[in-house]
Design a protein with these regions (language model features):
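A generic structural signal for nonpolar/aromatic side chains embedded in well-ordered alpha-helices
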Residues: 93-97, 244, 251, 307, ...
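Short, charged N-terminal helix-start/capping segments
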Residues: 5, 75-94, 200-206, 267-275, ...
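Flexible, glycine-rich active-site loops centered on histidine and acidic residues
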Residues: 250, 254-286
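Fungal secretory targeting signals
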Residues: 1-29
Length: 489
């Protein structure tokens, strides 16, 4: 008992120091968006859309600066100097990403990326069936095997969550429980009623908070581990599972297309964005994989297919950014789209239902092959994908490292499972694009030459602004490294 109390006290002290340090860093010299007259004037001249989210709507999340990121093991069969350079920079890249990641979609992407690099058997890419529901592996792992960084970020992302009505807030002070965590995911089986709400403030987006679904589900399962209970504290496993069920209710009650039930990216009105192809479909298919649920695998495949039908410009085989008000071909949107499709494919192929969805798999593989061809045909003279493709305005067409990195990451993942559907030309172009992204990463681990992710003054690349930092670009570079590591080329 004394040992446990000391252990908890030690972690509480560390957590307090972390919060104080983080707050000082944020209110001190950290200024990752250079707001200046030049940017404002440029945006006005380009007639760009409004920013993705206003600053006052930012999620109530403070980065935990105590997190430590190890050097990952590289693939020694890859002799590329740029690959070796990126390997050495990864801890700095992750540290920087952690320092500026605060919004719902950023947190979802960051936690997924950390899992891919450090705990890949918890992802569809190297799935271990013992992590599936009923396998019980999360409860048995020892200290060094637990994905502490992901669990801490996932827990802290729920700092503003309203736990009223949760299993642990019952009137008699005890947790209303079920033997199965999955019961809390569905209102029909939950011991306590759901209260429909998002996991985190989505800044008006219905889809973005859904990107956290895998991380919160993993947090729920690991919260049964006695070491996690001692070291992390937080809510009960049942509470986290219940919150996830609330998120699913909130998602499924949002605006949908009347013809095929494709879910909207936005809360207030029906809008389809390429971004959502990473947020919604693969989160649903991941639950399908983890729960061994054919229904959720089907949801994920159907949502990605519906979004593809609405957004793919088949004249060039490139995704439009938004189905109506921004039909331009945006690099990062295409990265979101193809990587979401890749995660979907890996989930269904790792599940027991691959043979059930043969037709959908074949269709998705064919679509991805054509989109990779279309995107790599657009590489500029630096071998980056232009921020907006097919534009006469050169400011809009500046090469974007963020979108390029995510497309390259998706391509290497695709190469691993569909080697017969690619060719040497595409693989060589992917390597050149890989090298082009790495060339733009500075010695401190900042990915430069990336689009302003918030669209503060328009989704534009400011290549000469060293203070324009992107949480997405940081995560995408790490995804690109891991994907190539596994492809082995």
């Amino acid at each position: 008992m004394t040992t446990a109390f000391a252990f908890i006290t030690f972690f509480n002290i560390l957590s307090l120091l972390s919060v104080l340090t983080s707050a000082a860093a944020i209110h001190g010299d950290h200024n990752h968006v250079n707001v200046n007259k030049r940017h404002r004037n440029l945006a006005k001249s380009l007639h760009l859309p409004a920013p993705r989210a206003a600053s006052e709507d930012q999620a109530a999340y403070i980065p935990d600066t105590s997190l430590h990121f190890e050097y990952p093991r590289r693939n020694f069969n890859i002799n590329s100097n740029k690959y070796k350079k990126l390997t050495k920079l990864l801890p700095k890249i992750f540290k920087n990403a952690n320092s500026i990641t605060t919004h719902s979609w950023e947190l979802g992407c960051f936690t997924e990326t950390l899992l891919e690099v450090y705990n890949p058997s918890l992802t569809p890419f190297e799935w271990d069936d013992e992590y599936g529901f009923g396998g019980g592996k999360c409860e048995k792992l020892e200290f060094g095997e637990i994905p502490w960084n992901v669990l801490k970020i996932a827990k802290n992302s729920l700092i503003a969550y309203d736990w009223t009505g949760s299993p642990s807030s019952s009137s008699n002070g005890t947790t209303k429980s079920s033997s199965d965590l999955q019961d809390y995911l569905f209102n029909s089986t939950s011991p306590v009623p759901h209260i429909s709400q998002a996991l985190i403030n989505g800044d008006g987006a219905l889809g973005d908070p859904v990107s956290l679904v895998p991380a919160i589900w993993i947090l729920s399962q690991f919260s049964k581990n006695h070491l996690v209970k001692l070291g992390l504290g937080g809510k009960s496993a049942e509470d986290y599972s219940w919150a996830l069920g609330n998120q699913l209710d909130y998602l499924f009650s949002g605006p949908k297309a009347p013809t095929n039930n494709t879910i909207s990216q936005r809360e207030a009105s029906f809008e389809l964005w390429a971004d959502m192809m990473y947020m919604i479909p693969p989160s649903l298919s991941y639950l399908g994989l983890s729960l061994s649920s054919e229904e959720y695998i089907k949801y994920g495949l159907e949502q990605w297919d519906g979004e593809t039908a609405a957004l793919l410009d088949t004249t060039v085989n490139i995704y439009r950014h938004v189905h109506d008000w921004d039909a331009r071909l945006w690099a990062t949107g295409n990265g979101w789209g193809v990587y979401g499709g890749i995660r979907n494919l890996y989930s269904v192929k790792a599940s027991p239902f691959a043979s059930t969805f043969t037709q959908q798999i074949t269709k998705a593989e064919s679509t991805l092959a054509s989109v990779f061809e279309g995107l790599f045909n657009e590489l500029d003279s630096q071998y980056l994908i232009p921020n907006y493709m097919g534009q006469d305005n050169q400011t809009l067409a500046v090469g974007d490292t963020a979108g390029t990195a995510l497309v390259v990451a998706a391509y290497y993942r695709y190469l691993k499972i569909c080697p017969d559907k690619v060719n040497d030309r595409l693989t060589k172009l992917a390597e050149r694009a890989f090298d082009a992204v790495v060339a733009k990463i500075d010695k401190d681990g900042w990915v430069t030459h990336a689009v302003d992710p918030m669209g503060t003054y328009g989704w534009v690349v400011y290549p000469d602004d060293p203070d324009m930092h992107s949480p997405e670009a940081q995560a995408f570079a790490a995804k690109m490294w891991k994907a190539r590591t596994e492809a082995g080329v």
